[in-house]
């Protein structure tokens, strides 16, 4: 049976084995998928040993940049993202690295939530790997404005500059953000600590702005609570992004695109009762 896994450290919390088991059952694909706790000091060796038999893998924190350096070839979106979250074993044992995070977020927004980016004003919060991974897909949708804001303005400006060839994007510090926006995506990890980036309330237009937090939890995240209190039209969390990036990886491995909606529903139900 073909073997797949997710590499991470820590990894016990991962929902990927459940997601891919549900995808496999739904599509009739015979495969085994497990979580692998990779050592912090030898990810490359650990991954290579898995791929002596393994066919593919997902990669989560803190190994996405190491996976980028490990592979023999990269997809264009992985090259742009500077990180790899999906590994595919090719004929002859070569490894190809891809990044499905941006595609997953975009699909969750446009297909699941019905949010369009074309000609919209979009604010991305943060300048780390999570935001880097979604910039190219977002710019491909041709928003009217794409602003990257970060606590350290220089990081946001530099990141925006790397993607300027793909469309109109600029960077600034949180204090320099002037709204309102049609869509605000929080790509910082502030919600994990119960915090919210320091933004002016004018970034949200009451009854119009959609707010999306890449984080998710049983209850609304700190960012989504903040947004709802200020009249955001809708608040969305990152559980759909998790399922959609997994569906894209499954498609890369098996050539079959699973239906994500029933899997997302199962996870949402499990999260609410867990």
UniProtKB/Swiss-Prot annotation:
Pathway, per record: Metabolic intermediate biosynthesis; chorismate biosynthesis; chorismate from D-erythrose 4-phosphate and phosphoenolpyruvate: step 4/7
Keywords: Amino-acid biosynthesis, Aromatic amino acid biosynthesis, NADP, Oxidoreductase
GO BP of this protein: amino acid biosynthetic process; aromatic amino acid family biosynthetic process; chorismate biosynthetic process; shikimate metabolic process
Domain of life: Bacteria
EC number: 1.1.1.25
Single GO molecular function: shikimate 3-dehydrogenase (NADP+) activity
Catalytically driven reaction(s): shikimate + NADP(+) = 3-dehydroshikimate + NADPH + H(+)
Active-site residue numbers: 64 (proton acceptor)
Chain positions recorded as shikimate binding sites: 14-16, 60, 85, 101, 216
SUPFAM superfamilies the record matches: Aminoacid dehydrogenase-like, N-terminal domain, NAD(P)-binding Rossmann-fold domains
Alphabetical list of InterPro entries matching this protein: Aminoacid_DH-like_N_sf (IPR046346), NAD(P)-bd_dom_sf (IPR036291), SDH_C (IPR041121), Shikimate_DH (IPR011342), Shikimate_DH-bd_N (IPR013708), Shikimate_DH_fam (IPR022893), Shikm_DH/Glu-tRNA_Rdtase (IPR006151)
Gene3D superfamilies: Leucine Dehydrogenase, chain A, domain 1 (3.40.50.10860), NAD(P)-binding Rossmann-like Domain (3.40.50.720)
Binding residues annotated for NADP(+), in chain numbering: 76, 126-130, 150-155, 214, 238
GO cellular component terms listed in the entry, alphabetical order: cytosol
Subunit structure comment from the entry: Homodimer.
Role this protein plays: Involved in the biosynthesis of the chorismate, which leads to the biosynthesis of aromatic amino acids. Catalyzes the reversible NADPH linked reduction of 3-dehydroshikimate (DHSA) to yield shikimate (SA).
NCBIfam families xref list: aroE, PRK00258.1-2
Similarity comment: Belongs to the shikimate dehydrogenase family.
Protein name: Shikimate dehydrogenase (NADP(+))
Gene: aroE
């Amino acid at each position: 049976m073909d073997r797949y896994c997710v590499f991470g450290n820590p990894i016990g919390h991962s929902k990927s084995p459940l997601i891919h088991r549900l995808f496999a059952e739904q599509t009739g694909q015979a495969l085994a998928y497990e979580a692998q706790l990779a050592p912090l000091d030898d990810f490359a060796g650990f991954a290579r040993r898995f791929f002596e038999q393994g066919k593919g893998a997902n990669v989560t924190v803190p190994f996405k940049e190491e996976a980028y350096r490990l592979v023999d070839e990269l997809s264009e979106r992985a090259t742009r993202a500077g990180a790899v979250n999906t590994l595919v074993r090719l004929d002859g044992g070569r490894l190809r690295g891809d990044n499905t995070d941006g595609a997953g977020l975009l699909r969750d927004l446009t297909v699941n939530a019905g949010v369009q980016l074309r000609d919209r004003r979009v604010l991305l919060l943060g300048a780390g790997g999570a935001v880097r991974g979604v910039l190219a897909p977002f710019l491909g949708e041709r928003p009217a404005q794409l602003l990257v804001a970060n606590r350290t303005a220089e990081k946001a400006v530099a990141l925006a500059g790397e993607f300027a060839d793909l469309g109109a994007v600029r960077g600034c510090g949180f204090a320099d953000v002037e709204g309102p926006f049609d869509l605000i995506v929080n790509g910082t990890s502030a919600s994990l600590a119960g915090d919210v980036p320091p933004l002016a309330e004018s970034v949200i237009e009451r009854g119009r702005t959609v707010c999306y937090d890449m984080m998710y939890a049983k209850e609304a995240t700190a960012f989504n609570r903040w947004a709802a209190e200020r009249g955001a039209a809708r608040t969305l969390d990152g559980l759909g992004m998790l399922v959609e990036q997994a569906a894209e990886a499954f498609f890369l491995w098996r050539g079959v695109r699973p239906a994500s909606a029933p899997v997302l529903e199962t996870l949402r139900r499990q999260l609410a009762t867990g």
